[in-house]
Each structure stands twice: as structure tokens, then as C-alpha cells.
Amino acid sequence: MMTSIILGEVLSKSAYESAMESILDRLAQDGDVAHEDNSFWQAEGERICEYNNLIKEDKKAEPSEILKNLYKENYDYKMVDDDFIFPVMVHNYLKRHDGTDDFIDRTVFSSILNKETNNKKNIMKNFNKVITSALPYYKTWKQLSSEEKERVSGKKSLAEKLIRIKEGMNAGDWRDSDKGLGGGVYSGNVNIYLVPASLKAIYTILKREYSDELKDIAVKNNLSSLLDILNSFSGEEKKSREMEELIDCWSQARKHFKVSLSCDEIRKRLKFFIKENNLLSDYDRNIIKELPLTVDCKIKDFIEGQKPDILKEGMEFYGISLDSECKPVEVMNSDTGFGFLLDEMDIKEMEEAVKIASLTYPRRLMTAGGLLTANPSVSEDRNLWKFLTVTSYHGTVIWSWQMTMMEKGLLYQAKKTASINKELSDKMRYLATELIKIENAIGEMRNFELWTIKGDKDKFIAVPYGEGSETESNAVQLWSTVSLSLLNPFNVP
């Protein structure tokens, strides 16, 4: 889904519709979006393994049920991010193809229901799911709204109402490896960027499509959260105060994830990381110390006491997740790409995000091999150093689609802010250009799903990730074509 959003105008109308239809075809009755469908040979392989395990455990009854469903598609609903990406996808489609309601009103055959259904009804089921999921945080926020804003945003009782990964799971978003969220249970990219973006998309669509028909759909399908919002619409402009409050509330949810470090604290933590991290070789330690932090200050100069201008005010970033105690998991990460592309950052946040992306690893995210997905170097938690290494699937590595999302988001915001903040616009354009140059320099590796880094003389360079990297990219996987989006980067995404 994110790939379709990133590709945007590069995709034809019919291709975009095909992507949405495949999502709607796998939609659960409650509007939950399937992350992946393991169909045909994949589902068959999984069930054969399950069958063999049950036979080994001498369970007689259950294997026969598995054989009955041997070739049935196996839908995976364990992720939470998909539910919030889909409304943005629908919104972008309607914005790009204004006046074309044929897809929304289309009658289709559902393989899950095994009968005909309607796209509009299924889209509204998803919207209801999103609104329902967002309401607990909003209701708690309203109850606490008489207190000072900063105190409210920091309250654990409020943070506990954020969107949590599903019980018993270790992942809930695109970082779907066991430790991809650093052990956290509240995903940063979901709560900071995707929920507000999805609510804004839903509100725009409901204003556009508002009718008695929508209310009928909500009533007939028991979509109570959606119906409440529709009933709150008033005036000729069809506005909903409740929906606007819901959006405003969620736009402030990012405060829970904020990490603020002074210059001295950064120095202390970075020194600790370089000295105590036994996963670093002496060779890599020496390279790190010699890396330029700024033009006239190396990493070793900084940890020995030099204070470059760019760090005098310290730094702020959003943690990769919140742990079970609702404390930020202090890992710098590339998820700000969602913020740039989905228009979910203000000027100050963009300035800080550009700073984080621009400076060299281990101080920030930039390497000669590309933009790092995660960097735990300023965390005092040694476990995070182990969870997010250069060999971890979602660790100190580079993901191709994340690079492209960042590049396209930066170029989009550079154009948008050119007339109001030229200095920031130029910085974003420069950073995007540098990232594109890096990708061009690493050659065919840029088409891999991901790659990692290793120390080489005076920098960290791109190297293939694990085994079989060359076979990870193919045309069936839409993300493999994501770099095509940069053929026309300045259109609104």
C-alpha cells in the first residue's frame, strides 16, 4: 500500500484501482486490512509444515482439518499499520482522479464472503475500524483536557490508549521482525504519522461523499463509530466538530515519543556507545572516531569536548516506539519519511528531521551506503545495540523503499516550502539529491530489498545484506518498482 502511495502519479488509474481492489478483496468483516496473503504454494507449504508438526505431536483430529484447507488462501491480519494506510490510499486516488466515482460505487465479487459486495460499503467498514481504533485515545484526551497540555501529553494513562501492536505479537508495522521496534509495543510511525494522516483522509472523503446513502450503509452494517461522525456533520460546508477534534487530538500524540537530549548528554551517550559496544570491531571504532561530524569537527573531537554549532542546542527526535511502560525507545530512525510524504510535520519538525538525516552515523542516520533505518547509538540500553545491528533485518541497515520515500517526501516538501522558507527548502532538496547520488553510486544493489554497511578505510559503505539479496527484488513485488516514483517527483503525492 505504501508503495502505491509513493509511486503515486506513476501508476495508471487502472493499476491503482487493482491495488485497492486486492486490498478490499482481503478485507475482514470488521474492516481490518490483511498485511499479506500467503496463497497457493505458500499457504500449502505452511499447512504441510503445520500438519507434520501435529502428526509428530500425535494429535489425531486436527491434521484432517488442515488437509481440507490445504489450498485455501491464508490471510494475515497481525499488522496494525495497514488499516491506517488504506484511507490515505483511497484519498490520493480520489484527489488524483477527481469526479470518477465508478470505482467507489463498483459492485465486485468478494473471495472472503464468497458473494457480491460493494466497494463503498467495504471502504466504509475500514473507515469505521480506523475511527473506532482512534476513539479511546481521543476520549481520554478529552477527559484530561482541563489540565495543562504538556502534562496531558505526558500522562501514561493517555499514552496507554495509543494504537498498540496486537497482543502476543512482537511487531505491528513495516518493521515486522521480532525486535524491529526495539522491543516496543506502540509503533512510532503508526501513532505519529499514519493515524493522523488516515483521519484527515477519512474526513476529506466523508465531506466529499456525504449522503443519506452513507448513513444507510453505516446503519445496515453496524458501523456505529462512522455513523456517529456522519450524524455530527452540520452546515452547508458539511463540517464535523467531533472529527476535527479527533484529528487535532491525534496530531499531538507524537509528544509521547519525543526524545530531547542536550549536547553534553549526546556526547556522554555516544562515547559510551563507541567504548562499550562489544559488537563493534576495533577497526570500526577507529573509523567512527575519524568520521566528520561537521566540516571542522570529527566524532573524536566531539566526544573529547568540542561543541560544534549544530549541536549546541542538543537535539530532538521521535523514538522508534514506546515500550510497555509507555516510555520512548530511544532509537533514531528513518520513519520521518512518512511525515515528509504524508504532510504530517510542521516547519520545526522538518528542520530537526533534516538535521538528523543529514549528519553522519553514528551521530545521526547518514552513511556512504545510504540512510539508516535505525540507529541506536544514543541509547543507553545495551539490548538495543544487540537488537538493531548491521545484521538485523530492521537494524542499522538501509531499506530501498524507505530511501525512496524519504527522497520523494523531501522533494515534495522542498517545492511546497520554497516560497515560505527557502533555506529549509534548499536543505531538503540538497539532502534528497545526496541520497539519490548515493543510490546511483551503489549500482544494482539499489534494487535490493535492503542492504547493510561495513567499515572501509574512512567510511561505512554499502554491502549486500545476508544471503540471496540479488533474488529479493522482482516485478511481482510492487516495492521493487518504487524508484520509478522519482521520474516525476514534484507532483503532490
Question: What are the residue ranges of the model-derived segments?
Answer:
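Acidic, mature catalytic/reactive cores of soluble proteins
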Residues: 1-493
